[in-house]
Regions:
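Short pre-catalytic strand/loop immediately N-terminal to key active-site residues, enriched for Gly-Thr
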Residues: 57-66, 310-324
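Conserved post-catalytic alpha-helical subdomain immediately downstream of the catalytic base
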Residues: 294, 313-379, 383-385
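Positively charged, low-complexity intrinsically disordered leader regions
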Residues: 22-55
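Hydrophobic beta-strand scaffold residues
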Residues: 84, 110, 202-204, 237
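Alpha-helix C-terminal capping segments
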Residues: 64, 71-83, 105, 336-339
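Conserved N-terminal subdomain of the carbohydrate kinase-like
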Residues: 83-175, 372-385
Length: 385
């Protein structure tokens, strides 16, 4: 059958408009294709975990490979079956070998700057010490980041054009990496600029680690560094009332302490000032967590997407290991956005994956995408036969 040329042009224009509308969801132009769906920039670490035993009495530890930025890439690869990469430092000694093996096992493509260990004092892959706590006893976290290789990373260390040569859809970094040194924040900005040139969406996790920032300037320095990074971000995550945006981009309000940790109005009040200051930001999302005890949390999430606020359901969590729950939320939320879910459903996927992640030992996921979708739809803990 002959189709008139004018009709062909009209059909072509309609298809192009449909593609444009699909790509322009959330106020963002998310690339539909790329060799890498997601690339994160950050430090790789190993976490020593004695479980419920405090370190002063511990006789054995599990070893978890982690990194706030890496965890998102690992979760997206392992649970959500996406093509991801991590840009980081690696050291040629047994701890580096252990970490590199776990990165490969999670299905994440590595882009490393290699450092040579001198056999005595480094450079090193950082060690995080974190017990799980129990009941009324809170978890305790401390670090050995002496002569850390990742803290020595600087602009010019990576060939971004090569890393992004096959196309990249999403680039991510975070406040933990920004806190390591003067040059890591500069490298984040360099990576963000290169990612934007490659057409990628850029996100930043506002996670705030007071112990890390106190080494070189404290809260005032954190404000300066994170504010400089935020102006390049399309998406911000991690602004819960425990830290994040509340300490990273604004002066804490006394009203925060007067309201429930699950009250989304706290989030909404902060959003107005942030998006006015950073009009480049189109999406902001965070978990809402009320800690009743180490093992019992109330869990929710909230997102602001292109001018509209969305709130997740709330559930009660029995916590096995809380480390990585926020990264679990972020990665599930990113997955929803990358796959074109509507904002409410993307938020539920993040909420569900973050909740499930707290039921596993370690910092990265053991969930399947089917489990996440089932829980997001209101699934229960009934046995599946």
């Amino acid at each position: 059958m002959h189709v008139p040329f004018c009709l062909k042009r009209a059909m072509s224009a309609l298809n192009n408009m449909r593609r444009f509308i699909e790509i322009m969801k959330y106020g963002l132009s998310i690339p539909k294709k790329g060799a890498l769906d997601f690339v994160s920039l950050g430090a790789l670490v190993h976490r020593l975990d004695p479980g419920v035993i405090p370190f002063r009495k511990a006789t054995e530890c599990a070893i978890h490979v982690s990194g706030g930025e890496f965890n998102c890439a690992a979760n997206l690869a392992d649970c959500f079956r996406m093509q991801t990469g991590v840009v980081s430092a690696m050291v040629d000694y047994p701890i580096g070998d252990l970490i590199a093996e776990r990165v490969r096992a999670m299905g994440v493509r590595p882009f490393y700057k290699m450092f040579k260990h001198n056999g005595v004092n480094g450079p090193n892959m950082a060690t995080v010490y974190s017990d799980c706590g129990q009941g009324v006893r809170a978890p305790v976290v401390f670090y050995n980041r002496s002569n850390e290789a990742a803290a020595q990373l600087k602009p010019g260390d990576f060939d971004w054009k090569t890393i992004f040569s096959g196309g990249v859809r999403w680039f991510h970094s975070g406040g933990i990496f920004a806190a390591l040194s003067e040059t890591t924040g500069q490298l984040i900005i360099e990576g963000m600029k290169a990612a934007k040139e490659a057409g990628a969406i850029v996100s930043f996790d506002l996670n705030y680690r007071e112990k890390l920032w106190n080494i070189w300037g404290g809260h005032k320095r954190a404000l300066s560094v994170i504010a400089g990074i935020a102006k390049y971000a399309d998406v911000l995550v991690g602004m819960g009332t425990e830290g994040g945006l509340q300490k990273g981009l604004s002066t804490p309000s006394p009203e925060v302490d007067k309201k429930s940790k699950l009250d989304p109005s706290v989030f909404s009040a902060m959003i107005d000032s942030i998006v006015n200051k950073y009009p480049n930001v189109k999406i902001v999302a965070t978990t809402l967590r009320d800690v009743h005890s180490t093992n019992h949390h109330s869990w929710g999430a909230v997102a602001w997407v292109d001018g509209k606020t969305y709130v997740s359901p709330t559930c009660e969590l029995t916590i096995l290991d809380r480390v990585g729950g926020g990264d679990g939320f972020a990665s599930g939320f990113f997955y929803g956005l990358l796959t074109g879910e509507n904002p409410a459903d993307a938020l539920k996927l993040g909420w569900a994956h973050g909740a499930l992640l707290t039921t596993f030992p370690g910092d990265t996921t053991m969930a399947t995408v089917e489990q996440v979708r089932e829980f997001a739809k209101g699934g229960s803990a009934r046995i599946q036969r």
